[in-house]
Amino acid sequence: MAFDETYNEPESTEVLVKSLDPEHPAQLHYAHAGDAGADLITTVDVTLKPFERALVPTGVAIALPAGYVALVHPRSGLAAKQGVTVLNAPGTVDAGYRGEIKVPLINLDPKHTAVFHPGDRIAQLVIQRYVEARFIPAETLPGSDRAERGFGSTGVAS
């Protein structure tokens, strides 16, 4: 089967975006066609010394439609180049939340301080549909090939 290089437009849904900082209007957008994550920026100066963390405001609040969730993911470039990542990745923004999206960043670089200025991209926001589970109490669970084997159960890469 050959790979189809045709770009298909992804599904879309409307998400209301409220700007909370008049100096930095809400600028949620996708950098490239096909990107899953929209850039989130900081609205304040942030300095993160090695192993320091901070809750960083983005100046953005959103209203998601029912059945959707927004996930705050790290930016791969920040992680690879500066050692900065989202502490609780991915962070969850539920559809009912209307407050400012804030990003808990941590600098995992042991030597270098990371500095961000208003307008710098600090994370990405991915919008996804989700399924709401009906949790059913059970005395026993059906068997599976994996059973109770957990951490490290698939072995170590050679």
Swiss-Prot record:
The keyword Hydrolase applies. Its EC number is 3.6.1.23. One of its GO terms (biological process) is dUMP biosynthetic process. Belongs to the dUTPase family. This is Deoxyuridine 5'-triphosphate nucleotidohydrolase. Pfam families: dUTPase. This enzyme is involved in nucleotide metabolism: it produces dUMP, the immediate precursor of thymidine nucleotides and it decreases the intracellular concentration of dUTP so that uracil cannot be incorporated into DNA. The keyword Zinc does not apply. It catalyses: dUTP + H2O = dUMP + diphosphate + H(+). Pathway: Pyrimidine metabolism; dUMP biosynthesis; dUMP from dCTP (dUTP route): step 2/2. GO terms for molecular function: dUTP diphosphatase activity; magnesium ion binding. Substrate binds at residues 75-77, 88, 92-94, 102. InterPro entries: dUTPase (IPR008181), dUTPase-like (IPR029054), dUTPase-like_sf (IPR036157), dUTPase_trimeric (IPR033704). The gene is dut. Its cofactor is Mg(2+). It comes from the Bacteria. The lineage of its organism: Bacteria, Bacillati, Actinomycetota, Actinomycetes, Bifidobacteriales. Keywords: Hydrolase, Magnesium, Metal-binding, Nucleotide metabolism.
